[in-house]
Amino acid sequence: MTLLSIDDLVVEHRSPGRPAVRAVAGASLAVNPGEVVGLVGESGCGKSTLARAVCGLNPITAGSIAFDGEPVTPLGLRRRKLTGIQMVFQDPYASLNPRRRVGDQIADGLRTSNDTATSPADLLERVGLPRDFAGRHPHEFSGGQRQRIAIARALAARPRLLIGDEPISALDASAQSQVARLMRDLAVDSGAGLLFISHDLSVVRLIADRIAVMYLGKIVEVGDTAEVWADPRHPYTKALLQAIPKPDGMGVLPAELPGDVPDPANPPGGCRFNPRCPFVMDVCREKEPEFGPVACWLHEPK
């Protein structure tokens, strides 16, 4: 059974006196138990908004999100804990309470899951940290150590779905791959699903079973990671991979691709990538491709 099912999700940001911005514009995605799905795309494409909607932190405008067959939005904080969904945020410095010992913060999750057999020190050990760190405060640790503590805190609630929203981008290079592999191993070993959002294609390539590529609020390509890397089909996916300077196809997403990113408040008609696409056809400007796993008129199902 599918663990997480996102169907035609729409999330709008509204500000007084300004038009609504569709940060997520009809995205569909699934995550299965024990599966790691990597979500990639340029900054501002809607990845984090989608993740926060899954956690119930952003209200949805249309579409649906189901966790284990049950709707998960809108949710308050307490209800979110009860769903078995936990999120590891981008900034390990901001995600931990500086005034509380890390062991006490991990213990909050253990109480949520009614786990009386596991101690905070046990979870610190699972994420590769010494047991005596439980008695210390967040300011005493490096960024990589803090993110491991944040992972331990998330695991304490025994989640069935773990979401990493750019969880390695604030870390130094030496810690990034270690933390990403740790999240994968812990999620898979427990049978949980992992939705991993990152700009770092090298890490996504190493840990993800499947990859989803997002552009201007839309999922434009989904597939097995190895297959997408070997044969990217959507022109946007091809552009992302071709723009990486490393010859092995590994590396961080470039800051910019050729062409200007359209305004999300006023997206182009038809396919949203058509102003930047080298293969654009008349139909691309006239009609949006509403099919998958590759949302491109070049790959219209027969």
Sequence positions of predicted segments:
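ABC ATPase NBD coupling module
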Residues: 16-18, 71-86, 104, 112, ...
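Conserved ABC transporter NBD signature motif
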Residues: 62-73
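Short catalytic/signature loops enriched in Gly
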Residues: 78, 222-302
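Conserved ABC ATPase "signature" region
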Residues: 117-132, 241-242
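Conserved ABC ATPase signature
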Residues: 137-141, 145
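A short, proline-enriched helix->beta-strand linker immediately N-terminal to the Walker B motif
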Residues: 156-160
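P-loop NTP-binding/switch modules centered on Walker-like glycine-rich loops
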Residues: 170-252
